[in-house]
Swiss-Prot record:
Pfam families: Ribosomal_L33 (PF00471)
Molecular function via GO: structural constituent of ribosome
Keyword Ribosomal protein: yes
Biological source species: Chlamydia muridarum (strain MoPn / Nigg)
Alphabetical UniProt keywords: Ribonucleoprotein, Ribosomal protein
Biological process annotations from GO: translation
GO CC terms in record: cytosolic large ribosomal subunit
InterPro entries, A to Z: Ribosomal_bL33, Ribosomal_bL33_CS, Ribosomal_bL33_sf, Ribosomal_zn-bd
Lineage, broadest ranks: Bacteria, Pseudomonadati, Chlamydiota, Chlamydiia, Chlamydiales
Homology family: Belongs to the bacterial ribosomal protein bL33 family.
Protein name: Large ribosomal subunit protein bL33
The keyword Disulfide bond is assigned to this record: no
Amino acid sequence: MASKNREIIKLKSTESSEMYWTVKNKRKTTGRLELKKYDRKLRKHVIFKEAK
């Protein structure tokens, strides 16, 4: 049976309390995820970091 390679993670904004939920491949992305996404509270693009 195949093992689960994907993990559900949350991305937290560095400038507000906004959060996104996304899926990450554990085998290919071993480090913490960091993406630039749109923050609806601030109405601009900011960096979102992986939080546990």
